[in-house]
Swiss-Prot record:
One of its GO terms (molecular function) is structural constituent of ribosome. Keywords: Ribonucleoprotein, Ribosomal protein, RNA-binding, rRNA-binding. This is Small ribosomal subunit protein uS15. It comes from Shewanella woodyi (strain ATCC 51908 / MS32). One of its GO terms (cellular component) is cytosolic small ribosomal subunit.
Amino acid sequence: MSLNAEQTASILAEFGRCENDTGSTEVQVALLTAQINHLQGHFKEHKHDHHSRRGLLRMVNTRRKLLAYLKRTENVRYQELIKKLGLRR
């Protein structure tokens, strides 16, 4: 239920500041968003998978906290990121 290596590499190339950037806030939020979108499709088929649903809620909360941090520290990068990812904020 995780992303494969090609998907991860494409996200790193699109959102990373350099080629080995895996820890910046933008990359972390983009990876979490891709995993959340993947799990949403999983739950359409497996409605009673409560164990994975708990993991999904943890990912959503982590993404929310990272976005709040980015908005508080660098609002311009925050606005660009949510526009690229198509988030509702």
